[in-house]
């Protein structure tokens, strides 16, 4: 590695993680040597469905409406990214393009040129390495060519936040790339949105928990995690072993996934999830608001992003009056039963617009879910402040990946 690469890497690390004072802090736990990344240790227990045999209607009925995670296979077989997203080709095509790999203490993006980041990836021994988690590539004249390398899987093409306007809508799509031990800390995606994550190269280890899982049960404390409290690898080192003990509440046992190349994970709104890269991983992920989850997303957007909701409503009334009418029926005083960080700015929907109208069944499903959650709320002990705009029940997708 040349001197300039070392300098740029050092600058990025200092900006993104100022609490880690030197190289010893970055490698203090020696996870590079002592933490097992063996895929065979993952207790993969989430249902898989084949894209070739799963219709959109079946997906909605079997997984989206009941808020059930699933892994979809073969949805990315025709993507050019399968050939184009190798380290060698990315380094050649985007070598001088800057990608976000963290945030500083003031919330500003920390970016690194692709050529320097790949140099870093290939040699790092850091406990929790910097991770490219870039949401702005689609608006950049050169980086937006990444959009040509994949298409949104057919199940996720509702893009209801498109009606909020490109400038006002929250970030919603991310190009993600990182080495072994990098990842995304435990969080819930904001504003009640659901998400999909398609892995092009590498392997990811997931744990998912239902929305009513008590925060204190699955969050690493400061005493336990120190400067690495919010890192995915810290979570798997501290919390995961507890989930396998007989004393762990059975109703909060995690769903586990070993995501392999070509697999797409569907994360319903409100589900806690944590993701660890087991090797060099390259993926794309998007949040989305659909006909099925619209009532919950609308509720949380009004509570957490009132200005956004007003503009969204005005355009929906013109373009999708049936959704505006549904929005009018949502009781904003009742909790949804779906936890999320309403104040987060990294939310939203898939990039591919859909001309299809929502069926009455789709429109009613989200409202039914809210009604069902209200009835179930006393049983599940959902956090009282689950819909507060000031609470911090989760961290945003971006911050949990870059901090």
Curated annotation (Swiss-Prot):
The gene is jmjd6-a. A motif (Nuclear localization signal 3) lies at residues 141-145. The keyword Iron applies. It is found in: Nucleus, Nucleoplasm; Nucleus, Nucleolus; Cytoplasm. Residues 394-403 have a biased composition (Basic and acidic residues). A motif (Nuclear localization signal 4) lies at residues 167-170. SMART domains: JmjC. Its main location: nucleus. Substrate binds at residues 184, 204. This is Bifunctional arginine demethylase and lysyl-hydroxylase JMJD6-A. A motif (Nuclear localization signal 1) lies at residues 6-10. A motif (Nuclear localization signal 5) lies at residues 373-378. Residues 340-357 have a biased composition (Low complexity). The nuclear localization signal motifs are necessary and sufficient to target it into the nucleus. It comes from Xenopus laevis. It catalyses: L-lysyl-[protein] + 2-oxoglutarate + O2 = (5S)-5-hydroxy-L-lysyl-[protein] + succinate + CO2; N(omega),N(omega)'-dimethyl-L-arginyl-[protein] + 2 2-oxoglutarate + 2 O2 = L-arginyl-[protein] + 2 formaldehyde + 2 succinate + 2 CO2; N(omega),N(omega)'-dimethyl-L-arginyl-[protein] + 2-oxoglutarate + O2 = N(omega)-methyl-L-arginyl-[protein] + formaldehyde + succinate + CO2; a 5'-end methyltriphosphate-guanosine-ribonucleotide-snRNA + 2-oxoglutarate + O2 = a 5'-end triphospho-guanosine-ribonucleotide-snRNA + formaldehyde + succinate + CO2 + H(+). Pfam families: JmjC (PF02373).
């Amino acid at each position: 590695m040349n001197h300039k690469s070392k300098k740029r890497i050092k600058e990025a690390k200092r900006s993104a993680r100022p609490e880690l004072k030197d190289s010893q802090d970055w490698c203090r736990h020696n996870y590079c040597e002592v933490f097992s990344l063996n895929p065979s240790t993952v207790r993969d227990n989430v249902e898989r469905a084949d894209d070739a045999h799963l219709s959109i209607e079946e997906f909605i009925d079997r997984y989206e409406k009941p808020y059930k995670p699933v892994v979809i296979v073969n949805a990315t077989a025709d993507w050019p990214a399968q050939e184009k997203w190798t380290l060698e080709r990315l380094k050649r095509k985007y070598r001088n393009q800057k990608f976000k790999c963290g945030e500083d203490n003031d919330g500003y993006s920390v970016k690194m040129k692709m050529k320097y980041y790949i140099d870093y990836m290939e040699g790092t021994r850091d406990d929790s390495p910097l991770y490219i988690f870039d949401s702005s590539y689609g608006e950049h004249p050169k980086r937006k060519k990444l959009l040509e390398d994949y298409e949104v899987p057919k199940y996720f093409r509702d893009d209801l936040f498109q009606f909020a306007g490109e400038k006002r809508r929250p970030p919603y799509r991310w190009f993600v790339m990182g080495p072994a031990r990098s990842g995304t800390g435990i969080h819930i995606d904001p504003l009640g949105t659901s998400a999909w994550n398609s892995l092009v190269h590498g392997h990811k280890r997931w744990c998912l928990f239902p929305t009513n899982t008590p925060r204190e049960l699955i969050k690493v404390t400061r005493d336990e995690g120190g400067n690495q409290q919010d890192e995915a690898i810290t979570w798997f080192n501290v919390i995961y072993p507890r989930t396998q003990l007989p004393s762990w509440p059975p109703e909060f046992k995690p769903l586990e996934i070993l995501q392999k190349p070509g697999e797409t994970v569907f994360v319903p709104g409100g589900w806690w999830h944590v993701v660890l890269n087991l090797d060099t991983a390259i993926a794309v992920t998007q949040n989305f608001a659909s006909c099925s989850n619209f009532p919950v997303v609308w509720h949380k957007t009004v509570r957490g992003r009132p200005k956004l909701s007003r503009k969204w409503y005005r355009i929906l009334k013109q373009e999708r009056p049936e959704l505006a009418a549904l929005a009018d029926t949502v009781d904003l005083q009742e909790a949804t039963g779906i936890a999320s960080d309403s104040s987060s700015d990294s939310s939203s929907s898939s990039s591919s617009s859909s001309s299809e109208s929502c069926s009455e069944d789709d429109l009613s499903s989200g409202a039914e879910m809210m009604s069902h959650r209200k009835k179930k709320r006393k049983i599940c002990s959902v956090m009282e402040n689950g819909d507060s705009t000031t609470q911090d029940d989760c961290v945003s997708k971006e911050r949990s990946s870059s901090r």
